[in-house]
Amino acid sequence: MSRILFIGAHPDDVELGCGGTISKFSDLGYNISVLIIAEGTSGRFDEKDKDTKKVATHIQNRKQNCTNSLKILGVNNIKFCDLPCGNLNIVPLLKINKLIEDEIRSFKPEIIFTHSSVDTNKDHRIVFESTKIATRPSAF
């Protein structure tokens, strides 16, 4: 069975950007995995509020909504890495690369979808760059 990996920066990126594609490949019987790099919420709050229960609850809700949406589309393998939203530029690129490389080694996808290199969101561009690095021929 063919395997497809979708890599998104935040919860909702994959289902909003590729929902139709996911649904089609799922209906065709492909094995689909989704990797979400950042938690998708903390960047929306002031620095003083980032470690509050409100933020933690918001993160959990976003993850649950993402999981529910992806299950409707036929995805059962979803991994959240929980890196800081809106701040992937302060995370060592090597760490993001490793998360993606580990998922590729584990899942062994034949096709990978991710963000565009010209996306306006900086987290999206960083995930694109890390995906490009993680999929270089010398990586495997």
Label for each model-derived stretch:
Residues 140:
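Active-site cores that bind ATP or allylic diphosphates and position pyrophosphate for catalysis
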Residues 10, 115, 121:
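Histidine-centered divalent metal-coordination motifs
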Residues 82-84, 114-117:
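Short, well-ordered beta-to-alpha junction loops that form the rim of enzyme active sites
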Residues 87, 120-121:
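Short glycine-rich, flexible loops that bind phosphorylated cofactors or substrates
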Residues 1-107, 133-137:
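Active-site rim/loop-helix segments in enzyme catalytic domains that contact anionic ligands
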Residues 111:
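Short, Asp-centered acidic motifs that coordinate Mg2+ and/or phosphate
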Residues 121-135:
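Short Gly/Thr/Asp-enriched flexible loops that form oxyanion-binding sites at enzyme active sites
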